[in-house]
């Protein structure tokens, strides 16, 4: 019936074999096909870029995205799993620029947009084969053949449909606005893209500049940390309610104005200046000043070069007076509100000064700082120069500093739908739950309009054509619509082709497409519709594709894909795009840093899989805090520990069963009866049915942490209690009903456990299932239904009894370990203290098991601790300090003198009176801190409401029994070393020793039974191994098969 199982398994090799089995038999395809026509479970796969190889950070969501669809398929749902590729956008273009050795917009245009896009098309799927091989080797079942690519014409057309829908709802607009801008990419970025990058500590120049008030010999001291913005200065801002001082600087002999609170920051000596006047900032409003550069003097007639009040001005840094240029969001708003100035931007696409600022033309803005400072110093405008250490954003793609600048862009009006976004978020089940109101909810509350246009080349073109004469706009929502308007056949929708499509306007002009392409995040957010070519594919039932039942990605996607899905789902349908989401944290290297090839701070993921197996890696990741959106410091040792502590014990349980089942020719019946007589069988069956109930509940709630914890608890119970306590039932020679029940129970437990574990560790479960399955079973474990609990066999009473016995055993073993008393050394007595009558009754029923487990001769159950310990007490200062005041010290001294019997009274609820001077104080249990002192020879441990004690006095008889148990263990080890079969009978050879003689006199039968020794023979020539029975007791033994 069963194949022989090797004790030591090569798990990576087994996994390779299982992969071949799945492929050869098309098991994945069968798992989906058998659910056709069933209820559909919709799953969206967030598209990765294929320009880099997958790493541990990808393995976490890919494991989660395998577990849930496998589980839902086993629950009878039809789950399509099509892989997707993000093929457009900055990551691809940046890779191509590096490959071609070009950089920036101008060089790309010189190279030719069509040529550039051809290179993008070539490189975009560079690593798809590697991705496919690695993801499949991880054990993830996903359809790469039916996958989607964002550069597919069908996908791009659906994105146009999404865009037009938003446009017609008034949610798309074009405007100038100050946006984060990447100089190297020559394009604006969205706010959430900025958050995907890194904020670095930078040391920028901090300048205090003198601005002369018009027609007066007085100066405003203005502070800035961006010297490069000074040539574009159009205003000055002060705080309306901030107090300012007009002073006479005795050294410089100048009249200066600055915030009163900042005088000490600028002057060490109060005698170096005289205060002329103090006033609120409102008094400065409207004052004109002389510009420090003359590049934009024409803006004076439009309201430039005046002082304005602004709420954002403070005296935390600088002077309490700041300069205004259209390179900051707040500055931009003030200029728009109070002036009619043109929004000047004297920078080219790479953030170098243009001819408008001729003195610094061609200089990158950050490089221009030094020359601007020199210029101001030369012309006596520089009052003070310092350095300012602060955090500054860097581009997440190029690692260059982001520049904020006014730029024309297309936006989604997120502000308009913000209330609805928050309502939609309430419908989503977030795992972990805190993200709903926390990171994601807060991001939605503060959401700004989304800049969706990019001044780039390889992307989905914004489908708006503008009349060259009137500026009239036409938004296109499909390929056919464009063909009808232009009269031209459309084969490709990319910029290099689509920009050739124009047509005449009735007004005499020509319709030309706006030059920008869409942010690739817009495409990702449109994935639910575009991956299905919705609404152009008629056969699609929309409710089957929207909203998704489930998605999963990393924490960074709260400001990326989760966000864009939510915006577009809300804007289009006023609904969430996904119902349930599992969010994972970051996987860092063991030193807590980001994993990096240049740092060489992590092992190649495929090497880890080939060493420990994908199951061990999957389990390691899913068991970790990373599943709860926390960071994980990855360690190879962690994967090794999972293999050692979980995978191998599962294998050992399976190996144990098959070994004895083969010996006894056990054949499982078609229908195993779960009605058993043995309490151990009843218990493990009950635990298994309870586990089924927990898993069906928790995985349905997407709580993988609780699910894994419950599975691991059961594996421990099965291995370390059920199998260990049932061994003798399998060992005995007679094949009675009890032995058969043990086989049936263990077979049922292991096989069912494998099906429960299958979504989590698909390889080892398949391997074990293939050896355990009967002719009536499914071809693969993954074609089974997920097991449902049989409530009739859940017996909470027996679970409580055995789990109490397990708890007592665990406490006793800890106590032994603490005092170096080996488990094989018998003890005379265990004392168990519990006031709970029900627990006392259960303990009496479990007495035989507990004594056997902890190797004790007698068990005594007590209702209180007095027989085991004496008490001492200390004052609880936290409690008493509130009410005793000056008597505290004296009362504390009296508490330390309390006798054991007084403390017992307090424990039993009697209020105890202490007199200090003329005052009386009454003590309760909360007022004291208990200290326990063990009575002679007793070792005591307390856990919650239970205290146990063991008698540590080892008599000569107990000692001899302990040596005998160790002797048996050493013989069993030698059997394993010599690869004896578990059923092999042996001759045991010993040397002449007084200790062995004593042991044989008392325990010969026990030794023979345990070791399957038919004869114990004195024979020096057969001795082969020296063994250590105790610290200084050694002997020689030998064994051979009979």
UniProtKB/Swiss-Prot annotation:
Enzyme class: ligase
Segments carrying motif 'KMSKS' region: 594-598
InterPro entries cross-referenced by the UniProt entry: aa-tRNA-synth_Ia, Anticodon_Ile_ABEc, Ile-tRNA-ligase, Ile-tRNA-ligase_type2, M/V/L/I-tRNA-synth_anticd-bd, Rossmann-like_a/b/a_fold, tRNAsynth_Ia_anticodon-bd, Val/Leu/Ile-tRNA-synth_edit
Compartments, record wording: Cytoplasm
Keywords carried by this UniProt record: Aminoacyl-tRNA synthetase, ATP-binding, Cytoplasm, Ligase, Metal-binding, Nucleotide-binding, Protein biosynthesis, Zinc
MF annotations from Gene Ontology: aminoacyl-tRNA deacylase activity; ATP binding; isoleucine-tRNA ligase activity; tRNA binding; zinc ion binding
UniProt family annotation: Belongs to the class-I aminoacyl-tRNA synthetase family. IleS type 2 subfamily.
NCBIfam families for this protein: ileS
Name of the protein in its database record: Isoleucine--tRNA ligase
Gene: ileS
């Amino acid at each position: 019936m069963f194949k022989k199982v090797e004790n030591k398994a090569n798990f990576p090799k087994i996994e390779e074999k299982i992969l071949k089995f799945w492929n050869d038999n098309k098991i994945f395809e069968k798992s989906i096909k058998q659910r056709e026509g069933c209820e559909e479970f919709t799953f969206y796969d967030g598209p990765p870029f294929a320009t880099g190889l997958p790493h541990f950070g990808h393995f976490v969501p890919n494991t989660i995205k395998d577990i849930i669809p496998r589980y839902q398929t086993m629950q009878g749902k039809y789950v399509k799993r099509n892989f997707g590729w993000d093929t457009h956008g900055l990551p691809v273009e940046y890779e191509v620029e590096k490959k071609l050795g070009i950089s920036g917009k101008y060089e790309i245009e010189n190279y030719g947009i069509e040529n550039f896009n051809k290179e993008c098309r070539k490189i975009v799927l560079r690593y798809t084969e590697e991705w496919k091989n690695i993801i499949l080797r991880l054990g993830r079942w996903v359809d790469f053949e039916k996958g989607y690519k964002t550069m597919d014409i069908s996908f791009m057309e659906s994105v146009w449909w999404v865009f037009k829908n938003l446009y017609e709802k008034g949610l798309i607009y074009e405007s100038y606005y100050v946006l984060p801008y990447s100089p190297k990419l020559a394009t604006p970025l969205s706010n959430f893209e900025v958050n995907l990058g890194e904020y670095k500590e930078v040391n920028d120049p901090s300048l205090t500049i003198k601005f002369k008030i018009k027609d007066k010999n007085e100066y405003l001291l203005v502070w800035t940390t961006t010297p490069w913005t000074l040539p574009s200065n159009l205003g000055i801002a002060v705080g309306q309610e901030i107090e300012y001082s007009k002073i006479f600087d005795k050294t410089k002999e100048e009249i200066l104005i600055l915030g009163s609170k900042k005088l000490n920051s600028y002057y060490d000596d109060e005698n170096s200046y005289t205060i002329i006047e103090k006033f609120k900032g409102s008094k400065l409003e409207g004052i004109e000043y002389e510009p420090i550069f003359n590049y934009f003097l024409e803006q004076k007639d439009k309201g430039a070069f005046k002082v304005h009040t602004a709420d954002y001005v403070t005296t935390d840094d600088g002077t309490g007076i700041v300069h205004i240029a259209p390179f900051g969001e707040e500055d931009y708003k003030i200029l728009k509100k109070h002036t009619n100035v043109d929004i000047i931007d004297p920078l080219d696409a790479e953030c170098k000064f243009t001819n408008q600022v001729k003195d610094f033309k061609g200089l990158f803005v950050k490089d221009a700082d030094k020359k601007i400072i020199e210029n101001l110093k030369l012309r006596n405008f520089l009052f003070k120069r310092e350095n300012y250490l602060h955090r500054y954003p860097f581009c997440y793609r190029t690692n260059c500093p982001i520049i904020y600048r006014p730029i024309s862009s297309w936006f989604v009006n997120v502000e308009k739908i913000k209330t609805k976004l928050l309502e939609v978020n309430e419908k989503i089940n977030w795992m972990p739950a805190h993200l709903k109101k926390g990171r994601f909810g807060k991001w939605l509350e503060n959401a700004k309009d989304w800049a969706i246009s990019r001044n780039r080349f390889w992307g989905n073109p914004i489908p708006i054509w503008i009349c060259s004469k009137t500026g009239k706009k036409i938004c296109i929502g499909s390929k056919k619509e464009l063909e009808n308007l232009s009269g031209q056949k459309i084969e490709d929708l990319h910029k290099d082709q689509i920009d050739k499509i124009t047509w005449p306007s009735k007004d005499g002009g020509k319709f030309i497409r706006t030059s920008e392409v869409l942010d690739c995040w817009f495409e990702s957010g449109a994935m639910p519709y575009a991956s299905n070519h919705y609404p152009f594919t008629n056969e699609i039932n929309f409710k089957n594709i929207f909203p998704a039942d489930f998605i999963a990605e990393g924490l960074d996607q709260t400001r990326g894909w989760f966000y864009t899905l939510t915006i577009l789902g809300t804007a289009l349908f006023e609904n969430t795009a996904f119902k349930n989401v599992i969010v994972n944290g970051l996987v860092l290297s063991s030193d807590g840093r980001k994993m990096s090839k240049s740092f060489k701070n992590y092992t190649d993921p495929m090497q880890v899989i080939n060493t420990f197996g994908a199951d061990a890696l999957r389990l390691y990741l899913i068991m970790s805090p990373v599943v709860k959106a926390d960071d994980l410091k990855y360690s190879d040792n962690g994967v090794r520990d999972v293999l050692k502590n979980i995978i191998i014990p599962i294998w050992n349980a399976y190996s144990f069963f098959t070994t004895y089942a083969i010996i006894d020719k056990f054949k499982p019946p078609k229908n195993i009866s779960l009605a058993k007589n043995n309490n151990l069988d009843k218990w493990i069956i009950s635990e298994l049915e309870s586990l089924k109930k927990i898993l069906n509940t928790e995985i349905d709630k997407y709580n993988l942490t609780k699910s894994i914890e419950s599975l691991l608890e059961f594996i421990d119970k099965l291995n370390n209690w059920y199998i260990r306590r049932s061994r003798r039932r399998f060992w005995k020679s007679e094949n009675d009903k009890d032995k058969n029940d043990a086989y049936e129970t263990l077979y049922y437990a292991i096989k069912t456990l494998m099906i429960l574990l299958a979504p989590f560790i698909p390889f080892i479960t398949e391997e074990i299932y293939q050896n355990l399955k009967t002719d009536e079973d499914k071809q693969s474990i993954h074609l089974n239904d997920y097991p449902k609990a049989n409530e009739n066999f859940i017996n909470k009473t027996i679970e409580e009894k055995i789990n109490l016995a397990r708890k007592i055993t665990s406490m006793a073993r800890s106590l032994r370990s603490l005092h170096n008393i080996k488990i094989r050394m018998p003890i005379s007595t265990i004392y168990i203290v519990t006031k709970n009558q029900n627990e006392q009754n259960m303990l009496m029923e479990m007495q035989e098991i507990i004594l056997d487990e902890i190797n004790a001769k007698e068990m005594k159950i007590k209702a209180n601790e007095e027989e085991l310990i004496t008490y001492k007490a200390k004052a609880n200062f936290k409690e008493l300090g509130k009410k005793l005041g000056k008597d505290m010290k004296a009362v504390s001294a009296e508490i330390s003198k309390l006798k054991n019997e007084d403390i017992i009274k307090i424990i039993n609820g009697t209020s105890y009176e202490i007199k200090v001077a003329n005052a009386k104080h009454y003590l309760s249990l909360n007022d004291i801190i208990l200290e326990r002192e063990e009575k002679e020879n007793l070792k005591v441990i307390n856990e919650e409401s239970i205290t146990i004690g063991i008698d540590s006095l080892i008599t000569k008889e107990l000692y001899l029994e302990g040596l005998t148990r160790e002797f048996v263990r050493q013989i069993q080890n030698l059997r394993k070393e010599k690869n004896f079969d578990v059923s092999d009978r042996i001759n045991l050879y010993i040397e002449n020793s007084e200790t062995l003689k004593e042991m044989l006199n008392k325990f010969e039968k026990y030794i023979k039974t345990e070791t399957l020794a038919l004869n114990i023979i004195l024979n020096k020539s057969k001795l082969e191994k020296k063994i250590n029975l105790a610290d200084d007791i050694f002997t020689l033994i030998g064994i051979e098969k009979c």
